[in-house]
């Protein structure tokens, strides 16, 4: 049973995505999404029960696996190239090609020397991220069924591509599972790039000029982080002959000169988690349908960035990479919080709030202390729950009222009492005792 559950957890959303891509029957799609979401949540819980407190490592590295991963990288690069040429975004295409060719060059130059014994590592942090993606991500997928039906009735000018939408959502979740379980940085890089590509496709779903512009903003910023990731892999493999994240942490704690690798990976985490000055892509994602915003903010995209930085926390602290994380995270937390309280657009309030909380998470992880790292994990958990609920309720209110301006929500308790109750629960979860976000932020102050 050791490898079976993690393999099933990764394969289930991937197979579901492929079936949804070719299926054109709405009834089949609705049933498949609901059943897959239920099974995904059950498998996530099963993995948590089996491995929490008992880390499990798997070694699968082989020339064939390297070839498969390189083929996936190539397919992702070709997809990026296709869209960049189609919309004449040549600098973005250059970023994508640069990192792909860097990985290919590394494989041919140092790939045979740089090895990985344990390619997947299911530790407590991975389990927490699996539960967030599996349960919250599955619920968002189910919510999307009703939301997207109404969305296309109200936006008749937008081509109905729901099969493609759900394909990308489940591919996103599969990549997220692969990413958080990866210990081999080459494998993590592949899943990392798939999440960047999926976010690009979801943000640009409507095909409007604004959606296309914002999707490419997300793409080039995340490709910049992907290039840093590729450089980190090449440096680590070429100088230290390993590709394992766990080995990098061991070398860092032994005071070996791995800080360039750590700094590159932290920078990569900044781009994915929308730290300033890269927060623009997450704000631009609001043009996408509400389920996309909920998915990006709560259970997938931005959580991948903070996941990587939290994983690096043991070797951060009083060094350049740690100081960089604390400084960027702290500045992002402060300025995004100030921006959030000055907005009247409901989604903008939530977006800036997300960015500020991500900044606090990064700042905590940057200290390198055990207490602050676990505080960061607490914020990740409670933020995922509260923010997903708030995005979904605000999105539903927007559909019903035709506006997401907070002033238009006046009287919502009378017109939509059940929705209002869910919204209040989400709001309370963000700042009132005994809900988790208040406890997490109190713990953050104590940790500092």
Spans of model-derived segments:
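Transmembrane helix-loop-helix hairpins at membrane boundaries of multipass inner-membrane proteins
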Residues: 1-11, 15-167, 242-253, 280, ...
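Cysteine-centered loop/knuckle micro-motif
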Residues: 32, 188-189
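Hydrophobic transmembrane alpha-helices and their helix-loop junctions in integral membrane proteins
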Residues: 139-188, 198-448
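Short phosphate-coordinating micro-motif centered on Lys-Gly-acidic
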Residues: 193
């Amino acid at each position: 049973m050791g490898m079976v559950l993690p393999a099933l957890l990764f394969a289930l959303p991937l197979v579901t995505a492929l079936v949804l891509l070719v299926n054109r029957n709405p009834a089949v799609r609705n049933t498949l999404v609901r059943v897959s979401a239920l099974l995904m949540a059950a498998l996530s819980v099963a993995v948590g029960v089996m491995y929490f407190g008992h880390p499990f490592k798997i070694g699968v590295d082989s020339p064939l696996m390297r070839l498969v991963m390189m083929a996936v990288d190539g397919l992702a690069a070709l997809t990026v190239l296709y869209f960049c040429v189609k919309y004449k975004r040549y600098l973005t295409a250059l970023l994508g090609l640069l990192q792909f060719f860097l990985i290919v060059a590394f494989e041919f130059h140092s790939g045979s020397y740089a090895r990985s014994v344990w390619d997947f590592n299911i530790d407590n942090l991975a389990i927490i991220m699996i539960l967030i993606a599996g349960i919250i991500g599955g619920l968002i997928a189910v919510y999307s069924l009703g939301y997207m039906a109404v969305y296309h009735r109200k936006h008749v000018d937008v081509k109905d591509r729901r099969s493609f939408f759900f394909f990308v959502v489940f591919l996103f979740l599969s990549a997220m599972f692969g990413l958080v379980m990866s210990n081999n940085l080459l494998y993590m890089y592949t899943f990392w790039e798939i999440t960047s590509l999926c976010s690009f496709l979801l943000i640009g779903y409507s095909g409007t000029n604004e959606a296309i512009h914002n999707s490419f903003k997300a793409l080039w910023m995340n490709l910049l982080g992907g290039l840093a990731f590729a450089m980190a892999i090449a440096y680590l493999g070429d100088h230290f002959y390993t590709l394992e994240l766990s080995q990098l942490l061991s070398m860092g704690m032994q005071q070996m000169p791995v800080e360039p690798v750590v700094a590159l990976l932290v920078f990569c985490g900044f781009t994915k988690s929308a730290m300033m000055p890269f927060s623009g892509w997450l704000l631009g994602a609001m043009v996408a349908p509400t389920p996309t915003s909920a998915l990006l903010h709560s259970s997938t995209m931005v959580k991948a960035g903070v996941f990587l930085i939290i994983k690096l926390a043991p070797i951060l602290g009083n060094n350049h990479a740690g100081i960089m994380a604390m400084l960027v995270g702290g500045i992002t937390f402060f300025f995004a919080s100030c921006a959030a309280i000055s907005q009247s657009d409901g989604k903008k309030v939530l977006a800036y709030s997300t960015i500020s909380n991500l900044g606090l998470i990064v700042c905590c992880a940057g200290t390198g202390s055990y207490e602050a790292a676990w505080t960061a994990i607490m914020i990740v958990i409670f933020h995922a729950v509260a923010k997903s609920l708030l995005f979904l309720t605000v999105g539903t209110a927007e559909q019903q009222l035709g506006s997401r301006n907070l002033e238009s929500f006046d009287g919502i308790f009378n017109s939509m009492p059940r929705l209002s109750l869910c919204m209040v629960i989400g709001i309370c979860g963000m700042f009132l005792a005994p809900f988790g976000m208040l406890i997490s932020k109190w713990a953050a102050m104590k940790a500092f």
